[in-house]
Amino acid sequence: VSGASAAAGASGSAGASAAAGASAAAGASGSAGASGSAGSGGFVFSGPGCVVPTKEDDEPTLLSQTGCVDPSDPTKAAATLVPYDVNSPLWSDGAAKERYISLPPGTKIHVKDCMVEPATCKSVDDGGTAEDEGHWDLPVGAVVMKVFLIGGARVETRLLSHVTDTTWRGYSFEWNDAGTDATLLPDQLDKPVGDQTWHFPSRSQCLACHTDGAGRSLGPTTAQLNRDYAYADGSMNQLDKFQALGLFDRTPARIAGYPSPSGDGTLEERARSYLHSNCAICHRPGATVSDMDLRFEVGFADTLLCNQVITAMEDNLDLPRMRLVPGDPTDSSLSYRMHVTSGTRMPKIGSNVVDPDGTKLIDDWITSITSCP
C-alpha cells in the first residue's frame, strides 16, 4: 500500500479527500466502546468488517464484496473502518488518498514502547528495525485500506491484509469508469489515466515494500498519526481518537509527529521526513537495501549518504559516483535518481511521475549542506 502526495502536502488535497471519506465511515451513530456494539464517534465495531480470506481461492472479486466498503455504495468506507491521515506521506504520482484501518472485533493495536518492553523493542539508537519505538503491531485479521484518486476520480483501492501471524497479503482493485465498484486484479497492470500511466502493483510487488524489516503496515505509526483529523463529530488528535475508541491495548507513549515535508519545520527536518517516508521503506537495516539508513530518527552521519561512493552494483547504472555531494545536487545520485523516469529511477516500484515539490525539497537541502559530518 503506497502513500499519498508527499511534499505537495499531507494537509492539502490528500488530507481533504481523506476527511471526505471519513464522513462516510463516521456517519453511523453509537456510543459504546470498541468491544461493544458501536464505537464512539459513529464507528461500528460489532460487524465482521473487512473480509480476510484464509485461502486465495476465497478472495472476493469485487471491492463491494470485501466488507471494507458499503456494498450499496462502494465509494463509502464501511462503518467498521476508522479513517486516518499521516504527517509525512509517500509520493504516489500526485494521487490524493483516503486511508482506513479495519480491526476484527475484540482485537487491539499493540504500540511498541521500548521502555516498557526492552526485550522485544529496540530503539533506533540500539539498531531497531521493524521494532522501532512507536511502531504499530496490527492484529491478525486487520486490514489497511487506501483509495487513490486522480482528478477526484477513484482509480485504485489497495487492501493490505494481516492473514496469519507470519503472513500478509496485498490486493489491488481497479475502479470501473463509472466509479460504481472496483475489480480485484490478478496481476500488475499499467493503465493510462489522464496524461499519466497509473501502475497497479502485483501482489508480490506489494510485499516487496511491505516487508518484515519495514514493519509490514508502513504508514500506521505513532509519529505518522500524531496529528489532528477532521472526523464527522469534530476535529481530534488521531492518537486520542484511537485511544477513545479502545483500539490500543494500552495508552501509547506520545512521540512527536514527523514534520510535514511542506510544513513549517527546518529545511533539514522536512527533507529528512520526506526521505523517511519515500526511501526508508527499503533503505534501513533489515529491509531490502540495508547499506543506507534513511529513517528520520537516524543521525545524518549514520545515514551513509554524505560523500559515500555508490555500490558496485549501482556503478553499472551510469549514475553520479557519490550518493550525496554537499552543495551539489546535480552530482548526487540521491537527487539524480529522483529526477529520472528510466530504469535507474527511485523508487523502483510505485511511481512513474517525478515529484516536483519533493525533488526541489531534496535539491534545496543538498545545496544547503556545506560539509559532511
Annotate each predicted stretch with a short phrase.
Residues G47-S123, D132, L138-L185:
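Conserved small-residue
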Residues F45-P48, H135, R154-P373:
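Sequence context surrounding c-type heme c attachment/ligation sites in exported
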Residues V1-C50, D126:
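Ser/Thr-rich, Pro/Gly/Ala-heavy low-complexity intrinsically disordered linkers and tails
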Residues T80-D85, G127, H276-C279:
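Short amphipathic alpha-helical surface micro-motifs
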Residues G128-A130, C206:
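Long, well-ordered early-domain segments
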Residues P53-K55, S72, P118, D125, ...:
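Extracellular/secretory pathway and lumenal proteins
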